From Swiss-Prot:
Chain intervals for the UniProt region annotation (Interaction with RPL5): 1-220
One GO molecular-function entry: preribosome binding
Name of this protein: Nuclear valosin-containing protein-like
Tissue specificity as recorded in UniProt: Widely expressed. Highest level of expression in heart, placenta, skeletal muscle, pancreas and retina.
Modified residues (N6-acetyllysine): 70, 156
The species this protein was found in: Homo sapiens
Record region (Disordered): 84-175, 197-236, 496-523
Motif stretch (Nucleolar localization signal): 49-52
Subunit composition and interactions: Interacts with NCL/nucleolin. Isoform 1 and isoform 2 interact with TERT and isoform 1 exhibits a higher binding affinity for TERT compared to isoform 2. Isoform 1 interacts with MTREX in an ATP-dependent manner; the interaction is required to associate NVL with nuclear RNA exosome. Isoform 1 interacts with RPL5 in an ATP-dependent manner. Interacts with WDR74 (through WDR repeats); the interaction is independent of RNA or pre-60S ribosome particles.
Biased composition (Acidic residues): 92-111
Biased composition (Basic and acidic residues): 205-218
Taxonomy of the source species: Eukaryota, Metazoa, Chordata, Craniata, Vertebrata
CDD domains per the UniProt record, alphabetical: RecA-like_NVL_r1-like, RecA-like_NVL_r2-like
Record-linked Gene3D superfamilies: 1.10.10.2010, 1.10.8.60, P-loop containing nucleotide triphosphate hydrolases (3.40.50.300)
Name of the encoding gene: NVL
Annotated positions binding ATP: 305-312, 622-629
Length: 856
């Protein structure tokens, strides 16, 4: 019977499967289920109605057939390729034997068959010698023996019998010189020469034989030399790798001690902190005092503060002042991927410090390895914290002679595990906050010691212009100011060269003009080409040119625009341009704010003598647009205090506990940077009136804010200001004495105040320039301005200026001559038609009632 066929195969389906596979839709691996689903989806007309499982089985069968055909095809291709390679190899071997060429690569690729030919001939001769009759001399055997053992002779001598090489080959070595399929298969019967040395071998090509032997020996020598060179190179590479691994292990085994050259005089603006540090470091110089008293000296110091405030600098200054080696390690360097290796690194670190005592260990960014263990995400973090606690405790167990001081630095002290901050570990915490104006002045004087400045440089004015700047920001400011000074001097030299083109030692612009040609360029291109000319010039400046080079105050002012203080990213707001001159009217409120905030800062001794210790809080209430936020900025600027602006809703967070933590962080930041003003804008969103029904996050935020304002901890030199449009919905507990005890109502301005506001906005009629027919007093007393706030008056002046600009643009468009741009009375009349009051009569009555209720 015929074998049963494998079954019917749909050729159309087979072609579609092949098309799908070649389209790379399936990637590297093929899923039959996905393949069947895609085919049913793409070819829904043909396969859409088929059952899924049956169609999947059919697709799987087709796929197996395609796979087997592909494997067979690949096998055939490999076989053809192998045969072609064998054919090429045979052709190369034939060419080699004909030309006797010496090729190193062929020797490397193919083994030398000489030893195999010799063994075959030797075994054959020995076998023939032992049992000559048992070997049948077939024509093939005779031909093989002839080609392998018979020396090559000319046709004159005839042939040599088969038994002669068998007898002569006893104890002899053979070199086959007869060309065969394989190269180097040349045999010569040396025993013939030994038995009959006088017998000449007819026309043996001695010279060719010797050249072949020499080339064979050279080839083997080259191969040996190549092998030895490769071995030496491999050995050198291995030695280099071993040495690198050993160096890496030696480097990882222990950190190197550093000698610091920084002193306390290099740390400016932290006199109180330095005094505290000096009192704390007595045990490092006089450990016998603590030993005599039987007291364990402090071992750990935690430095915390915003980035750039000088934590690392202070640690190096401590080491430099005590003249002790410092072992600096970044916290992430301790963490390792192997379990237990991080703890081993910590132990080795402390062991190295104890063996080299007295010394200092400085762990930078310590919060990276010491998170709170209850919220740690990995067991490794908990183990590292536990190991660090153990190492800190072991320092107290060692004798008092092991003087080791551990200093940690972090930006987030609240994220550290509480066990690290107890007594005996990091029990001394030093806060480096945002420097105030006096501290900034001393920091600038310290940074500018080596800078070339004019004799009468105003450090006080520069410190006043840099609120919120920390030490790193001031250093960046000095660097930017130096760059501005260099650019200014080089531009000045170029201007001198334009006036005096004969000067050769100045930066030349002739080359630049040659490159530019005569093509007209714009102003920007001229500036770019001028800067490129400065870069291309390589001549150094002379002493005469650099004699007047120094960094002026204007260079610092120009550099202020390119340096963003770190405190601005931390929530501090710099307000260098808002003063009392920018606020019109509100004289009584300015007096109240001066007594509440400015007087305690400027006259602290008098307030302390009267027992006025707790700073007062001020609530600014009133309709929107009356200048509440502007007042807060002016107060902070006039007093020179640090200023934190908090928008009420930005502290609220959807996660439980995060809103309260944000409130705590704001007050902690203000305490670290005291004296400081905290301004809560729209405080009604943060502290709404509590009721019996509410038990949500807003209640917790109000409670947290109440405790921070007037809780168990006194807020020294932290002033609170708040602004709101709805004082009636604020929780009454916020408004009691000790918190926001002073409420100032900033209401709608009367005509006299409106006149002062208009004069302030227009800079007394100079900006924008007012025409002679404009009477600000009449505008301020107009009945249409009754409900206007300060923001409405500013919008009125702006709209009048736009009307004047529109009229001037229409005049120029019609072809008339360009006139003088001024704001006239008719422009204000047009502005009155467009600007409406932001406070309605109903709202005005409500705010008047609020003012009466607050004044009771």
């Amino acid at each position: 019977m015929k074998p049963r066929p494998a079954g019917f195969v749909d050729n159309k389906l087979k072609q579609r499967v092949i098309q799908y596979l070649t389209s790379n839709k399936c990637g590297k691996y093929v899923d039959i289920g996905v393949l069947a689903s895609d085919l049913q989806r793409v070819y829904s007309i043909d396969y859409g109605r088929r059952k899924r499982n049956a169609f999947r089985i059919q697709v799987e069968k087709v796929f197996s057939i395609i796979s087997s055909e592909k494997e067979l095809k690949n096998l055939t291709e490999l076989e053809d390729e192998h045969l072609a390679k064998r054919a090429r190899q045979g052709e190369e071997d034939n060419e080699y034997t004909e030309s006797y060429s010496d090729d190193d690569s062929s020797m490397e690729d193919y083994p030398d068959p000489q030893s195999a030919n010799h063994m075959n001939s030797s075994l054959l001769s020995l076998y023939r010698k032992g049992n000559p009759d048992s070997v049948s001399n077939t024509p093939e055997m005779e031909q093989r023996e002839t080609t392998s053992s018979t020396p090559r002779i000319s046709s004159k001598t005839g042939s040599i019998p088969l038994k002669t090489p068998a007898k002569d080959s006893e104890g002899g070595w053979f070199i086959d010189k007869t060309p065969s399929v394989k190269k180097d298969s040349f045999f010569l019967d040396l025993s013939c020469e030994k038995s009959n040395p006088k017998k000449p071998i007819t026309e043996i090509q001695d010279s060719k034989d010797s050249s072949l032997l020499e080339s064979d020996m050279k080839r083997k020598g080259k191969l040996k030399n190549k092998g030895s060179k490769r071995k030496k190179e491999d050995l050198q590479e291995v030695d280099g790798e071993i040495e690198a691994v050993l160096q890496k292990k030696a480097k990882a085994r222990g950190l190197e001690f550093q000698i610091s050259n920084v002193k306390f005089e290099d740390v400016g603006g932290n006199d109180m902190t330095l005094k505290e540090v000096c009192k704390m470091l007595i045990h490092m110089r006089h450990p016998e005092v603590y030993h005599h008293l039987g007291v364990v000296p402090p071992r750990g110091v935690l430095l915390h503060g915003p980035p750039g405030c000088g934590k690392t600098l202070l640690a190096h200054a401590i080491a430099g002042e005590l003249d002790l080696p410092i072992l600096k390690v970044a916290a992430p360097e301790i963490v390792s991927g192997v379990s237990g290796e991080s703890e081993q690194k910590l132990r080795e670190l402390f062991e190295q410090a104890v063996s080299n005592a007295p010394c200092i260990i400085f762990i930078d960014e310590i919060d990276a390895i010491t998170p709170k263990r209850e919220v740690a995400s990995k067991d490794m973090e908990r183990r590292i914290v536990a190991q660090l606690l153990t190492c800190m405790d072991d320092l107290n167990n060692v004798a008092a002679t092991a003087r080791v001081l551990v200093i940690g630095a972090t930006n987030r002290p609240d994220s550290l595990d509480p066990a690290l901050r107890r007594a005996g570990r990091f029990d001394r915490e030093i806060c480096l906050g945002i420097p105030d104006e006096a501290s900034r002045e001393r920091i600038l004087q310290t940074l500018c010691r080596k800078l070339r400045l004019p004799q009468a440089f105003d450090f006080c004015h520069l410190a006043h212009l840099t609120p919120g700047f920390v030490g790193a920001d001031l250093m960046a400011l000095c660097r930017e100011a130096a760059m501005c000074a260099v650019n200014r001097v080089l531009m000045k030299l170029q201007e001198q060269q334009k006036k005096n083109p004969e000067m050769e030692d100045l930066p030349s612009k002739g080359v630049q003009e040659e490159r530019l040609g005569t093509e007209p360029t714009s102003e920007t291109q001229d500036e770019l080409q001028r800067l490129l000319g400065l870069l291309r010039d390589q001549d150094p400046l002379s002493e005469e040119q650099m004699q007047g080079l120094c960094i002026e105050l204007n260079d610092f002012i120009v550099a202020l625009s390119s340096v963003q203080p770190s405190a601005k990213r931390e929530g501090f707001v710099t307000v260098p341009n808002v003063t009392w001159a920018d606020i019109g009217a509100l004289e009584d409120i300015r007096e109240e704010l001066t007594m509440a905030i400015l007087a305690p800062v400027r006259n602290p001794d008098q307030f302390k003598a009267l027992g006025l210790v707790t700073p007062a809080g001020v609530l600014l209430a009133g309709p929107p647009g009356c200048g509440k936020t502007l007042l807060a900025k002016a107060v902070a600027n006039e007093s020179g205090l640090n200023f934190i602006s908090v928008k009420g809703p930005e502290l609220l967070n959807m996660y439980v506990g995060e809103s309260e933590r944000a409130v705590r962080q704001v007050f902690q930041r203000a305490k670290n940077s005291a004296p400081c003003v905290i301004f809560f804008d729209e405080v009604d969103a943060l502290c709404p009136r509590r009721s019996d029904r509410e038990t949500g996050a807003s209640v917790r935020v109000v409670n947290q804010l109440l405790t921070e304002m007037d809780g168990l901890e006194a807020r020294q030199q932290v002033f609170i200001m708040a602004a709101t449009n709805r004082p009636d919905i604020i929780d009454p507990a916020i408004l009691r004495p000790g918190r926001l005890d002073k409420t100032l109502f900033v209401g709608l301005p009367p005509p006299a105040d409106r006149l002062a506001i208009l004069k302030t906005i227009t800079k007394n009629g100079t900006k924008p320039p007012l025409d002679a027919d404009v009477n600000l007093e009449a505008i301020a007393g107009d009945l249409r301005c009754d409900c206007y706030t300060g923001a409405d008056l500013s919008a009125l002046v702006r709209e009048a200026s736009i009307c004047a600009l529109r009229q001037e643009m229409a005049r120029q468009k019609s072809g008339n001559e360009k006139g003088e741009l001024k704001v006239s009375h008719k422009h204000f009349e047009e502005a009155f038609k467009k600007v409406r009051s932001s406070i309605s009569k109903k709202d005005q009555i409500m705010y008047e009632r609020l003012q009466e209720s607050l004044s009771r």
